[in-house]
Amino acid sequence: MWILIYLFIIWSSLRTWVTAVDSTTTVGDDLNETVSASVWPTMSPQMTVAFRSQRDVMGNLTIDQLPYVGLNLRRVLLNNETSMVNEGNNTRLLTLFKSMLSSEANAFVLDLEQYNNDLRVVDTTLLFSDVLIALESFIFSTQNNLYANIIVLLLNISAPELDSTEYRHQNQTLNTTYILDKNLGNSFIYKPTDLQSDRAKNNTWNIYGKSSIDGWPTLGSVLYEQKKRLVIGELTDFFNETTAPYIFPHDVFHYEQGNSTLDCPSTVEGLTDLSSIHWRFLDSLFNSVDIKEYISCGLSPIISNSAYVNNVTQLADIIHEGSVWSWDSDQPSVTQSTSKSGSSSGTLEAYNCVLLYYFANNETVTWRVGNCYNSNIGLCRYENMAFRWLVRSNKATYFDFDSYQGSKCPDQYSFNIPRSPLEQRSFIAYMRNSSFSDTQIWIDLNSISVSNCWVSGGPYASCPYEKVISRRNFVTMMVPASVCSFALLCIVVYLSVLRVPIYDNRKNWRRVINKISKSELEGVPS
């Protein structure tokens, strides 16, 4: 019985160890997973980590200020030149749409027309409900902290050719709420009523990080607290609050086609003015060069490059250039473990911290992984001011720049990071005005706690995806317990195999007892 008990203890210890080892590599293992269909090029492990780290960095930005990269589905996928559309190949169209959802694109413009008291995708036989079912499938498969992201669906509704009376009647009888509830469900949709509720609870913010009655909630609040994934908006004026309570009206979005009327800001005042405009979209033709410039100017590009179905995946390069505005082309380096090691020169190495490289000749910046033990200057931000920066001249390791003893940043400043293309543009303006040469600067981003999980919050920030026990701490914790368990097991085995001598010689012991018993007096003493 005792053997079984202690074997169970050992088995439990080993099982816990295996679980902990698996948990420390979960993020790395997830790099090999994919939720993409085979039609669209899948993201590499490096690209997956880069895209996820950007999302996490932007967690405290409001959803209206995020940089979205979108596709105009009618131009890119559902145009009349696509043979699948002419053939009515809806299955393949939906397969390609699902694979687009799994790419870096996170905004889509969809043209719909009213058809028999329903909505149908223009120039196809696809119903709006078919698209919603595909969306629901994708959202369910990515409803976790690793893959979840906000999707914006912008609708262009074509009015039927009817007189005004018939038009009003059909508009009122078209039940969009029923269509959305039946084929997608309202739990994933961030609705106008949700925005009203957030504003009533002071859960909406402006660019200064202060509660605002005309602001929007943060990405982290929408994704992780409210578990919302989809924002639906209308670009036309077909619906109203009564007929489509789940859909935001057209005046919420700043949507332009062709050329933008918004100037690209170069001053803090210009950046602040631009940030006061919500949901800035530009629907136009883009290439892999100019899309980065539009992103850095605070616009969310909607790609309208006409494509054939056989070459539609060539747009993946353009989407990639627009969606990754931070990391260098070969970054971040994907590792299998986080460890501290010594080089041949005897110095410590831990390539788990991020340096922002500034190039003065062309005024560009990029992020690269660096050795946390190297000494560099660091980046500080003034309180909650999104566009006010300070670079400290005193060098320190990543661990020393922002530690428990205090930060190297002065009072009212904190160790920080550009969280969006606009903030990065304001940093470039600061570096230009301060006449900095080419410089490497620590920013608040590292993967010290878990490999490939890049987090902000200093060197002691934990990975948000799960509760993880590091290998180093786990070994320190489990070695004493394992040694004690093994020692107890050895004692039990020893006592079970080697009997105590008194039991090993029972006959002699019984003879001695009988001899002593005979010498005892019997009866009652007189």
From Swiss-Prot:
GO terms for cellular component: membrane. The chain crosses the membrane at residues 478-498. Glycans are attached at N32, N60, N80, N89, N156, N171, N175, N202, N240, N259, N311, N362, N433. It is found in: Membrane. It is a single-pass type I membrane protein. Residues 499-526 are cytoplasmic. Residues 21-477 are extracellular. Keywords: Glycoprotein, Membrane, Signal, Transmembrane, Transmembrane helix. Its main location: membrane. Residues 1-20 form the signal peptide. InterPro entries: Telomere_Capping_Maintenance. Belongs to the MTC6 family. May be involved in telomere capping. PANTHER family: MAINTENANCE OF TELOMERE CAPPING PROTEIN 6 (PTHR35518:SF2), MAINTENANCE OF TELOMOERE CAPPING (PTHR35518). This is Maintenance of telomere capping protein 6. It comes from Saccharomyces cerevisiae (strain AWRI1631) (Baker's yeast). The lineage of its organism: Eukaryota, Fungi, Dikarya, Ascomycota, Saccharomycotina. The gene is MTC6.
